[in-house]
Amino acid sequence: MKTKITLVLLLAGNLTLFSQVLSYADQAVLFSSEDMLGTARYMGMSGAFGALGNDLTSIEINPAAVAVYNGSEFASSIAYRDSNIKSNFYGNTIDNQDDYFRFSQIGGVSAWDNFGNPDIFKFSVGFNYSVTKDYNNNYIVQGNSGVPEFLEDPFLNYDDDPDNDVFYNNVEDQTFINYTSGINDRFTFSFGTLYKERFYLGASMTFHHINFYQSTEYKEINNDGSGDFLDAYNNQTLSTYGNGFNFGIGTIILPTDNLRVGVSFQSPIWYNLSERFNEYLDIVLSNTNEVYVESYDPNFYDYQLRTPSKLNGSLAYVFGSAGLISFDYMYQNFRNTKLQPSSAFTVENQDLSSSLRNTSTFKVGTEWVFNIITLRGGYRLAQSPYKEAGDSFDLNGYSVGLGIRFSRNFGLDFAYDQSTFDDQYRFLDIPGVDAARLQVTNSRFVSTLLFSF
């Protein structure tokens, strides 16, 4: 039963409550977005790898990258994230800081020489597991909009008795707590070949998994102007989980020995998702001994999601064994995001089409080798998919990296990445009440253990 999608739940009498968990449209955007996660080499160059290859995470951007390998490689990565979310609601600002640690990537590649065909110089296969989105976040919003969500005594019948004129319309405090957890991860299988020494060709199949949990708490204290108080507490929980599939194709072309051009396409991800929605409400009045409580049976609902496809164009120049510079451009058609079955999501799909825009992401990275030490750096800019979002809602990020090659077979890579963007969360759907503003800064440190053989 798709109760949550209506955003309005009639609890009792005249009491109306709005959904505070993410809407289906907002979930669709969230599940279509990715973090900067992967190997430390990839992150150290801000992901500008579409024309380079020779990195396990780059295979997920351009499958032809697997064919660049000349041998076999195994890599595993762990990531630490420091999250700072600064919330502002009607002039009241709260700094919310948390840190998280997780295993983020593991994979391997094997390459073989040609099988007697003079045009096919080698064949490569690869496997990579990676976390694409970390949903762990926690923040508090507190302030006073001056407009109450809970105005009336739930035990009084305002429609049938006109003498019931007690309204708790003086807001003293409004607090919203949002807790999310879970991950979006994927398994990518890729294969590629080098054709006539100038054309790397590749294809991939990727299996995705989503496990998302959200718990929201809303607390409001109001008074009636005569010394009596209403204290309301509302808790909503949402669990969404499921699996998806997509495919990718790509090529890397070498017009000269130093110049590389990459083009790749990632199909939409087709998800089958299931959700569970719970809700609890209690209201305490200071002038009575009664407590109003509503607790609902869980709602379960299954649906499908189609995320945007991705088109990536890349250009890189390699200065022999000394270093390189690389540029990536990615285009995503967010307006084609769809929820299904279409008959059940007419309003949401119209909202996605009208409120979203197709986006561009720009990445630039560089790498320089000094004997066994490699230094890296990068910058990226990712547009917000929301049409009405200002420039501050775009994501800006930079990265630095260090690689140490202890031997031909063993190395360690490290990377630091920081990104910032603005966001908002509308936990009160009341005309004239603003959404909470959020300033989000994520700082990540990643290390990768590398074996070549």
Predicted regions and their residues:
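Sec-dependent N-terminal signal peptides
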Residues: K4-G13
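Outer-membrane beta-barrel translocator/receptor signature
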Residues: A40, L52-I61, A67-Y139, G182-D185
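Short structured motifs
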Residues: I61-N62, V433
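N-terminal targeting signals for Sec/Tat export/insertion, comprising classic cleavable signal peptides
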Residues: L30-A51
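Short, glycine-/Ser/Thr-/acidic-enriched flexible segments
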Residues: G50, R81, M330-Q332
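Sec/Tat signal peptide C-region and signal peptidase I cleavage site
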Residues: L15-S19
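Outer-membrane beta-barrel porins/channels
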Residues: Q20-L37, A111-F453
